[in-house]
């Protein structure tokens, strides 16, 4: 035996493989206020005990590796390791468990969602001992939250900038999403804003393609904004998508938007990446731009119930990284979204303090301290008949976005915008008068049709449209 080996042995190093649960499963651990807490849905491989699976998640997402290493003796594992501190079965699922893991705050770089996710959901999702793994929720402690800027402006500052109060904001995604020239695109923007919408929007995959380069689009959309503002007396905006192939190009586009004097830009935060998103968010705060966030690619990550990451985690990450709006499903439209679960992460986006509520999928109490809120955006397959439900579900602090539900109006874009604005104003007035939108919604819309031919035409076109498909990602215990 060499002297080196003898030295290592003499300080207690023992090579080999040992069970994770001997080090990382600590049911006696009392969580600290500064810990980041995670709730994982764990599906172990056959023969792997849930305690070992939960401990493996804690180890592989913090300080552990597959074998004992002598450099463990050069640090304090008790200080830095993740700990699986509780395991509970999932109701109705024999092979699934919720494993709760606590991570010491010093494991993470300040102000970096990128680093936080690299640790917590980095390698561990490919771990062979697990058949599947899903991150259901995170508790971000105030000590970590305070290292982030968060949304560039937040809900109240946005309302003050736009001078719009007491109702949801109305938007529209310009369709067809690809193929229009910049001038025709700007014309559609003008018609929608002139008809009564607050915002129009680039679709997520509108960047700078051969048929419409970004600079041309920005110029024609700015012209549409200023013309519609002059005619209506209302502040208008268009979400100019600054997403690009490099961070430098993205910022260049945001700079041009600022020079044009428009109020808001847009970013695809998952395809663009958290580092790019945080950089753009900082630029927007420094330069007075609102930031609209699209969640393109989210369903790749969050739709399957037993593997991936729930959208409530992506929503929390966005609030840290920064954005003033984010798409949050509709409950009633064409895209996936369970009602209680959606309302849970909508509250996590908007409110300062959210209590633990498992009936809405919220595993931890979340205190956002002074971090501004984010407006949830309801978008995808919605039309005027959905307006009462959307107003009731999302409340005033939201953006209701009708793409086909505006541009598909039989009389054109501007009448489509008029129909949506009239429907919204009717629902808000009825709610303020004490009427129940959930019960009387259709009647309220029919009454408004009597004095708005544009709304009457829209109601006739979409009276039979339904998206009656079951939700894939339901809360536990739901049939």
Swiss-Prot record:
Sequence positions that bind Mg(2+): 201, 203-204
Subcellular location: Plastid, Chloroplast
CDD domains per UniProt: RuBisCO_large_I
Protein name: Ribulose bisphosphate carboxylase large chain
Family stated for the protein in its record: Belongs to the RuBisCO large chain family. Type I subfamily.
Lineage of producing organism: Eukaryota, Viridiplantae, Streptophyta, Embryophyta, Tracheophyta
Residues with PTM N6-carboxylysine: 201
UniProt GO molecular function: magnesium ion binding; monooxygenase activity; ribulose-bisphosphate carboxylase activity
Gene that produces this protein: rbcL
PTM description: The disulfide bond which can form in the large chain dimeric partners within the hexadecamer appears to be associated with oxidative stress and protein turnover.
Keywords carried by this UniProt record: Calvin cycle, Carbon dioxide fixation, Chloroplast, Disulfide bond, Lyase, Magnesium, Metal-binding, Monooxygenase, Oxidoreductase, Phosphoprotein, Photorespiration, Photosynthesis, Plastid
Site feature Transition state stabilizer, where: 334
Modified residues (Phosphothreonine): 330
GO cellular component: chloroplast
Catalytic residues (UniProt): 175 (proton acceptor), 294 (proton acceptor)
Cofactor binding mode and count: Binds 1 Mg(2+) ion per subunit.
């Amino acid at each position: 035996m060499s002297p080196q080996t003898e030295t290592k042995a003499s300080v207690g190093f023992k090579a080999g493989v040992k069970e994770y649960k001997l080090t990382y499963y600590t049911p006696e651990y009392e969580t600290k206020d500064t810990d980041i807490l995670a709730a994982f849905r764990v599906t172990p491989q056959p023969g792997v005990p849930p305690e070992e699976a939960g401990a493996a998640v804690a180890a592989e997402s913090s300080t552990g590796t597959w074998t004992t290493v002598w450099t463990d003796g050069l640090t304090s594992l008790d200080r830095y390791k993740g700990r699986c501190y509780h395991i509970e079965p999932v109701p109705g699922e024999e092979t699934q468990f919720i494993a709760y893991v606590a991570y010491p705050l010093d494991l993470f770089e300040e102000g970096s969602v990128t680093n936080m996710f690299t640790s917590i959901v980095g390698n561990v999702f490919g771990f062979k001992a697990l058949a599947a793994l899903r991150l259901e929720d995170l508790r971000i402690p105030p000590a970590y939250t305070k290292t982030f800027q968060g949304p560039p402006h937040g809900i109240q500052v946005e309302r003050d900038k736009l001078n719009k109060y007491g109702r949801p904001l109305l938007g529209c995604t310009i369709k067809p999403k690809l193929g229009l020239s910049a001038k025709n695109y700007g014309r559609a923007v003008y018609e929608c804003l002139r008809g009564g919408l607050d915002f129009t929007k680039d679709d997520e995959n509108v960047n700078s393609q051969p048929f419409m380069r970004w600079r041309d689009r920005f110029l024609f959309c700015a012209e549409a904004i200023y013309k519609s503002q002059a005619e209506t007396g209302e502040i208008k905006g268009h979400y100019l998508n600054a997403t690009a192939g490099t961070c430098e190009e993205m910022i260049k586009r945001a700079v041009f938007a600022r020079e044009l004097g428009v109020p808001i830009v847009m970013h695809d935060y998952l395809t663009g990446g958290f580092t790019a998103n945080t950089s753009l968010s900082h630029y927007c705060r420094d330069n007075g731009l609102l930031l609209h966030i699209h969640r393109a690619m989210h369903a790749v990550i969050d739709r399957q119930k037993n593997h991936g990451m729930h959208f409530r985690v992506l929503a929390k990450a966005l609030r840290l990284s920064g954005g003033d709006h984010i798409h949050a499903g509709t409950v009633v439209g064409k895209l996936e979204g369970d009602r209680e679960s959606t309302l849970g992460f909508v509250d996590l986006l908007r409110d300062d303090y959210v209590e633990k509520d498992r009936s809405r999928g919220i595993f931890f109490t979340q205190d956002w301290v002074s971090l501004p809120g984010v407006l949830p955006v309801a978008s995808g397959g919605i039309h005027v008949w959905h307006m009462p439900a959307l107003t009731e579900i999302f409340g005033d602090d939201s953006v209701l976005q009708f793409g086909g539900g505006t541009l598909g109006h039989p009389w054109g874009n501007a009448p489509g915008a008029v129909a949506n604005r009239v429907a919204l104003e009717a629902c808000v007035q009825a709610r303020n008068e004490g009427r129940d939108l959930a019960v009387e919604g259709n009647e309220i819309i029919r009454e408004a049709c009597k004095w708005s031919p544009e709304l009457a035409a829209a109601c006739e076109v979409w009276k039979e449209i339904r998206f009656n498909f079951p939700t894939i990602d339901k809360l536990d215990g739901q049939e």
